Regions:
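Noncatalytic linker/hinge segments flanking ATPase motor cores
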Residues: 32-35, 42-45, 49, 82-84, ...
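Core alpha/beta structural scaffold of self-assembling particle/tube/pore-forming proteins
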Residues: 89-92, 96-406
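Mobile, glycine-rich extracellular loop/lid and propeptide segments
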Residues: 1-8, 41, 45, 64-114, ...
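N-terminal "assembly arms/tails" that initiate or stabilize quaternary assembly
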Residues: 1-65
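Short, glycine/acidic-enriched capping/hinge loops at junctions between secondary-structure elements
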Residues: 50-55, 79, 397-398
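Solvent-exposed, flexible loop/coil residues
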Residues: 24, 28, 32, 45, ...
Length: 406
């Protein structure tokens, strides 16, 4: 009963994690399973199509995203048999909720860190919270252009100060009275506003952008090192050069390359007014002023085939690389996303033998699993208890998300 109650508390405490795709697998609880096992989440194939009567068979290329269940997080506490005599509601409030809240915040924080480091599209101004709805609508436009459906599963996750800024900015505008009432009474954006569900999460992660304002970056799109002409990959390792000064790129920094335009995944045409494709740096690297430096970015630069995501209007031996920010600004990275952008996978942990109590609760619909293990200490009538979860995060369709810098 206590284990099931703990699982329900966890579901209620999750914020960011409640808005993403969640997967649960019970195969890892078998004897011999090891922490670090990997799930491969399949992604649907994509086709180009042919005009005219002639047959043109395309290969079926189904891709997958590995989700490594590498994080076992737990909260350890103890209570007495007298505590167990309390009603379940009292026990939940005094013991379970504080313990599970720590687990929920850890899961959310890890998820938001993963989202920040894997989301390339970005809007806003680093260091300044957005004051207009246009910033969030532009983020939504990126989702539209990348093929995200408007199916009621879009969400906007904001940190407290960003949320306070936008609510204050919109308080006098023409908004349905029920939305105004909700904003006034709760101090938050209405749940279903501007085409997305708004949620506040204090675990939104800040990006400290690299500081290299005096450096000029370039990429030789003529040689196109790391560019992929067909097929699929999640990242590309491209070659950058720096002049004037070295450039210390940080994980999570965003860059664009002149002449490399983003395309819609279905019609493969540049969207918007020929917007440049955003790329996120996946690992810290310093671009030297001599020679070229390999920089790994996401998404991969795919110029043709079924998974084409860029078009090259022209090439250059020194295409200008423009950073979103290069002044070392610290900026909370709020997230506008579709539910399928990221995935959280949970798995069962084995139940140990020789203990006072070992229980596990899991729910495939919720995509969650939790284990509670208790031992009895006869000397002082105490019951040491640990609550464990095993989970992993991965970007499923990171192009269906957009960071909102604040």
């Amino acid at each position: 009963m206590i284990t099931n109650e703990a699982l329900m508390v966890l579901e209620n405490e999750l914020t960011f994690s409640s808005e993403v795709e969640r997967n649960y697998d019970d195969q890892f609880a078998v004897t011999g399973a090891k922490i670090g096992a990997t799930l491969n989440v399949r992604k649907p194939g994509r086709f180009i199509g042919t005009t005219g009567p002639a047959l043109n068979v395309e290969d079926f290329n189904e891709t997958s995203v590995p989700v490594t269940l590498s994080t076992q997080f737990h909260v350890d506490t103890q209570f007495t048999s007298q505590d167990l005599a309390l009603s379940l509601d009292m026990f939940s409030d005094r013991v379970l909720k504080p313990a599970v809240a720590a687990i929920a915040n850890k899961i959310d924080f890890d998820g938001l860190t993963m989202a920040k480091n894997n989301t390339a599209n970005i809007v806003g101004t680093a260091g300044t919270p957005p004051t207009g709805l246009i910033t969030y609508l532009t983020a939504g436009a990126y989702l539209d252009s990348e093929g995200a459906p408007r199916d009621g599963r879009r969400s906007c996750i904001v940190e407290p100060f960003t949320g306070a800024t936008i609510v204050d900015s919109l308080k006098g505008l023409f908004v349905p009275s029920d939305k105004i009432s909700s904003q006034y009474t709760k101090g938050m954006m209405g749940r279903d506003s501007a085409g997305m569900n708004w949620k506040m999460d204090q675990n939104v992660v800040a990006q400290t952008f690299g500081s290299y304002a005096t450096a000029t970056l370039a990429c030789a799109t003529t040689t196109a090192t790391g560019f992929i002409s067909t097929g699929w990959a999640s990242t590309s390792t491209i070659a950058l050069t720096a002049t004037t000064a070295t450039a210390g790129l940080k994980q999570g920094d965003v860059i664009t390359i002149a002449g490399v335009f983003a395309v819609n995944p279905q019609n493969r045409q540049a969207y918007g007014s020929n917007r440049l494709r955003n790329f996120v740096v996946t690992a810290p690297v310093t671009v030297a002023t001599t020679g070229t430096t390999s920089v790994t970015v996401s998404p991969a630069v795919i110029t043709g085939g079924q998974f084409q995501n860029v078009s090259l209007a022209s090439t250059s031996a020194s295409a200008v690389v423009t950073p979103f920010n290069n002044t070392g600004t610290v900026s909370p990275q709020n997230i506008v996303m579709h539910k399928n952008a990221f995935t959280l996978a949970c798995a069962d942990l084995e139940l140990p033998d020789g203990v006072h109590f070992a229980g596990r609760a899991s729910d495939k619909e919720l995509g969650l699993s939790m284990r509670v293990v208790r031992q009895y200490t006869i000397n002082n009538d105490s019951i040491p208890t640990r609550v464990d979860v095993l989970y992993g995060w991965a970007p499923l369709y990171p192009e269906l998300a957009c960071r909102v810098a604040a």
